[in-house]
């Protein structure tokens, strides 16, 4: 196993090996880059299976700080999506988990931290991919989850970061 690593883009349209991030034991499955704290610098969120999901913040010098945990610390995360789910203008985090762990939403608090966990799905989904899009034209980002050995689902956002309705498509149990 190896650490995740950053490769730095050069003017000559090539990349050079940059710093390693995260522990060597990491089981990285996905990552996403976004400004999660409103400082106009992108953070890196690394999604790990059977290990902590970690957010790495930039310093004013451009260095990465030690990762802070988002999630339970022992999630089985396969994918991650970011978008404003409750209309407060702050980016929220959606985790797609497997191995019998519930999928989770983390709403961004006013202090740019991620608070309470909101579960979505059955709690025992085997989700492999998650994305956000307004699927019903109401102006709110909905969650689209692709699952293994069960139906894929769209979870409809009520505009407050809650997903009381869903529908299935494709997969094992769709109509």
Regions found by a protein language model. Give the residues of each.
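Short coil/loop residues immediately preceding or within conserved phosphate-binding loops
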Residues: 28, 50, 77, 100, ...
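Blade-edge motifs of beta-propeller repeat domains
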Residues: 5-26, 56-76, 107-125, 156-175
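Hydrophobic beta-strand segments that make up the repeating blades of beta-propeller
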Residues: 1, 44-48, 93-97, 143-147
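Glycine-aliphatic tripeptides that mark coil-to-beta-strand junctions in extracellular
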Residues: 40-42, 89-91, 139-141
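Beta-propeller blade termini
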Residues: 29-38, 78-87, 128-135, 175
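Structural signal for beta-propeller blades
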Residues: 3-6, 52-55, 101-104, 151-154
């Amino acid at each position: 196993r190896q650490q995740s690593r950053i490769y730095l883009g050069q003017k000559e349209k090539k990349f050079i090996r940059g710093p390693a991030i995260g522990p060597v034991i990491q089981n990285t499955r996905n990552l996403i880059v976004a400004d999660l704290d409103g400082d106009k610098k992108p953070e890196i969120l690394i999604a790990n299976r059977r290990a902590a999901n970690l957010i790495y913040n930039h310093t004013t010098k451009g260095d990465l700080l030690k990762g802070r945990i988002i999630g339970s610390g022992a999630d089985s995360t396969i994918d991650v999506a970011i978008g404003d789910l409750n209309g407060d203008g702050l980016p929220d985090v959606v985790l797609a988990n497997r191995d019998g762990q519930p999928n989770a939403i983390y709403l961004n608090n006013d202090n740019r931290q991620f608070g309470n966990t909101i579960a979505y799905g059955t709690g025992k989904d085997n989700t492999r991919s998650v994305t956000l899009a307004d699927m019903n034209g109401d102006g709110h980002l909905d969650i689209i989850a692709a699952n293994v050995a069960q139906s894929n689902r769209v979870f409809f956002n009520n505009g407050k970061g809650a997903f009381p309705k869903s529908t299935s498509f494709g997969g094992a149990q769709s109509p």
